Amino acid sequence: MKVRPSVKPICPKCKIIRRKKRVMVICENPKHKQRQG
């Protein structure tokens, strides 16, 4: 899980979702998991 100020999809399978007012990226590749912090 990477915590960064701006989250962007890295590959075509990355999906941007909102959980508990947090913007997150979920993907099949675990390296692409991101969260806005």
UniProtKB/Swiss-Prot annotation:
Coiled coil: none annotated. GO terms for molecular function: structural constituent of ribosome. One of its GO terms (biological process) is translation. Keywords: Ribonucleoprotein, Ribosomal protein. One of its GO terms (cellular component) is cytoplasm. It holds the Pfam family Ribosomal_L36. InterPro entries: Ribosomal_bL36, Ribosomal_bL36_sp. HAMAP family: Ribosomal_bL36 (MF_00251). PANTHER family: 50S RIBOSOMAL PROTEIN L36, CHLOROPLASTIC, LARGE RIBOSOMAL SUBUNIT PROTEIN BL36C. Belongs to the bacterial ribosomal protein bL36 family. This is Large ribosomal subunit protein bL36. It comes from Hydrogenobaculum sp. (strain Y04AAS1).
